[in-house]
Amino acid sequence: MNILQNLKESDPVISNFINSEKNRQETHLELIASENFASIAVMQAQGSVLTNKYAEGLPQKRYYGGCEFVDEIEELAIQRAKKLFNANWANVQPHSGAQANAAVFLSLLKPGDTIMGMDLSHGGHLTHGSPVNMSGKWFNAVHYGVNKETSELNFDEIREIALEKKPKLIICGYSAYPRTIDFESFRNIADEVGAFLMADIAHIAGLVASKLHPNPIPHCDVVTTTTHKTLRGPRGGLILCKDAEFGKKFDKSVFPGTQGGPLEHIIAAKAVAFREALQPDFVNYSQQVIKNAKVLASTLINRGINIVSGGTDNHIVLLDLRSINMTGKIADLLVSEVNITANKNTVPFDPESPFVTSGLRLGTAALTTRGFNENAFAEVGEIIADRLLNPDNSLIESQCKERVLTLCNRFPLYEGKLEASIK
């Protein structure tokens, strides 16, 4: 059975859009830090007959019949997640990282309680207390930031804020912070003020799993993450704990607290991704992600473009475009015109609005999946610099796009295997 052929016949409009998106991914350099390319096996699992099955509850404790096989799948996903992150408890049902965070808040907090996370403009996340998010509307959100000189965490300042505000929950883990997170120092501060400590490792989960970034599990009361990004799985969420008894309270906060039936086809895809991440070659992949990010950062620095914090320890490279008198909005448009996908982003102490910004956020996870190495990323950095430093030069624009397409052809997405896998 050719699944896409069936789709083409039954809904040619959607089929054409899917093919257009496939072509876009093949012919563009994906540098959005929160994106990656899932394996064919992961996509096959999430496109399986498991999408037909309703399974409210936990394995062996369902509210529906016919769950014997999805029980096996979900239990396997749980065991693999625990092994991957050295945790004693896991819930694989959250539909997203935001849903995982919401379940934690429901378990640990009451409306009006004080939570403390990084300011969104400094690299935090909407779900860590932004006023436009439920976390900032239901709770008293206070924020910490980075040091103005170094753009890195300053634990003396964080401790002072915690001592003054006495939060019930401290959140560490970010969406645009390129440096290593010291979870032990956060634990010490949380203990001093009597707060719960939650780590949101959505961006660095793959690096943590590969033991290339410190693991928050020993230090935090609860850990949340997405399953895509550096973990390279399907879009979804995950909650982890070192204390199995403590973790059980989050089960009820996921269901029935914040969700209904779990997406068992996505849970199967998570299980596949966890198995992939447990293989030795995934460590090699994660090592390459970091190597590539360092090369990308140094290439841009050598061309006179400032990088927030002066470099990176993970997959994120955050450009501070004030060094070339450009906004993130303009830079995003310029690189998109040569088939490079990135996103405008605020930088610490940004004078521009979130709709304009002074930064451009890049990530190396997706292109590393395509096989890009340090030499290839040096070329990517040169292309970006050439485009940003010559915004009105149409000849250079054309040359940059040509160089991008050459790289795309050199490192094909799925190497032509995608069509064969669906027949």
Swiss-Prot record:
<comment type="similarity">
    <text>Belongs to the SHMT family.</text>
</comment>
<feature type="site" description="Plays an important role in substrate specificity">
    <location>
        <position position="228"/>
    </location>
</feature>
<dbReference type="InterPro" id="IPR019798">
    <property type="entry name" value="Ser_HO-MeTrfase_PLP_BS"/>
</dbReference>
<dbReference type="InterPro" id="IPR049943">
    <property type="entry name" value="Ser_HO-MeTrfase-like"/>
</dbReference>
<dbReference type="InterPro" id="IPR015421">
    <property type="entry name" value="PyrdxlP-dep_Trfase_major"/>
</dbReference>
<dbReference type="Pfam" id="PF00464">
    <property type="entry name" value="SHMT"/>
</dbReference>
<dbReference type="GO" id="GO:0019264">
    <property type="term" value="P:glycine biosynthetic process from serine"/>
</dbReference>
<dbReference type="InterPro" id="IPR015424">
    <property type="entry name" value="PyrdxlP-dep_Trfase"/>
</dbReference>
<feature type="binding site">
    <location>
        <begin position="124"/>
        <end position="126"/>
    </location>
    <ligand>
        <name>(6S)-5,6,7,8-tetrahydrofolate</name>
    </ligand>
</feature>
<comment type="function">
    <text>Catalyzes the reversible interconversion of serine and glycine with tetrahydrofolate (THF) serving as the one-carbon carrier. This reaction serves as the major source of one-carbon groups required for the biosynthesis of purines, thymidylate, methionine, and other important biomolecules. Also exhibits THF-independent aldolase activity toward beta-hydroxyamino acids, producing glycine and aldehydes, via a retro-aldol mechanism.</text>
</comment>
<dbReference type="InterPro" id="IPR001085">
    <property type="entry name" value="Ser_HO-MeTrfase"/>
</dbReference>
<protein>
    <recommendedName>
        <fullName>Serine hydroxymethyltransferase</fullName>
        <ecNumber>2.1.2.1</ecNumber>
    </recommendedName>
</protein>
<dbReference type="GO" id="GO:0035999">
    <property type="term" value="P:tetrahydrofolate interconversion"/>
</dbReference>
<dbReference type="GO" id="GO:0030170">
    <property type="term" value="F:pyridoxal phosphate binding"/>
</dbReference>
<dbReference type="InterPro" id="IPR039429">
    <property type="entry name" value="SHMT-like_dom"/>
</dbReference>
<feature type="modified residue" description="N6-(pyridoxal phosphate)lysine">
    <location>
        <position position="229"/>
    </location>
</feature>
<comment type="pathway">
    <text>Amino-acid biosynthesis; glycine biosynthesis; glycine from L-serine: step 1/1.</text>
</comment>
<keyword id="KW-0808">Transferase</keyword>
<keyword id="KW-0963">Cytoplasm</keyword>
<feature type="binding site">
    <location>
        <position position="120"/>
    </location>
    <ligand>
        <name>(6S)-5,6,7,8-tetrahydrofolate</name>
    </ligand>
</feature>
<keyword id="KW-0554">One-carbon metabolism</keyword>
<keyword id="KW-0663">Pyridoxal phosphate</keyword>
<comment type="pathway">
    <text>One-carbon metabolism; tetrahydrofolate interconversion.</text>
</comment>
<dbReference type="GO" id="GO:0004372">
    <property type="term" value="F:glycine hydroxymethyltransferase activity"/>
</dbReference>
<dbReference type="GO" id="GO:0005829">
    <property type="term" value="C:cytosol"/>
</dbReference>
<comment type="subunit">
    <text>Homodimer.</text>
</comment>
<dbReference type="InterPro" id="IPR015422">
    <property type="entry name" value="PyrdxlP-dep_Trfase_small"/>
</dbReference>
<feature type="binding site">
    <location>
        <begin position="353"/>
        <end position="355"/>
    </location>
    <ligand>
        <name>(6S)-5,6,7,8-tetrahydrofolate</name>
    </ligand>
</feature>
<keyword id="KW-0028">Amino-acid biosynthesis</keyword>
